[in-house]
Amino acid sequence: MGSEMCIRDRLILTVLQECIDDYLACKGEKKPSIPVLDFLSTPVEELRTRAEEISSQLKSLSFPVSIVETLSRTGGGTMPRAEIPSIALEITPVGSSLEKLARILRGGDPAIVGYVSGDKFLLNLRTVFPSQDQSIVNALLETLQ
């Protein structure tokens, strides 16, 4: 079983290396969009601009929404390899528990999956496609009104 694992690991590494080589070989051409690279390379100011636009559309909510600086972590869950500055929307529940707010947002359509930090719910925009911004606004307005 040990040698089978090494062979599978080598195969995975070889395929990954080929993908990266193909991507890097696109000199002068428009590189294909790779979502994770798009997420990692988005400038913080672009995230802030998106957050300001989203936040401006949420002023009617009874829940305070603010924009905060945060960190995104890359790598495997328990062993993050790097931290990248990011921007998050911070939602403070009013008249509702934090757990209930998170559960309602996760159960919505579309599901909004953020994380809890202290007594706030955060939605890190580095993990959201720009094309999803309006869907998030609509879902938050519908869910939290």
Residue ranges and their predicted role:
Residues 8-58, 70-71, 80:
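Structural motif of enzymes handling amino- and sulfur-group chemistry
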Residues 1-7:
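Short, small-residue-biased leader/transition segments that mark boundaries at the very start
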Residues 3, 18-28, 52, 56-63, ...:
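Generic secondary-structure signature for well-ordered alpha-helical cores
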Residues 48-131, 135-136:
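Conserved C-terminal alpha-helix-loop-beta "cap" of PLP-dependent enzymes
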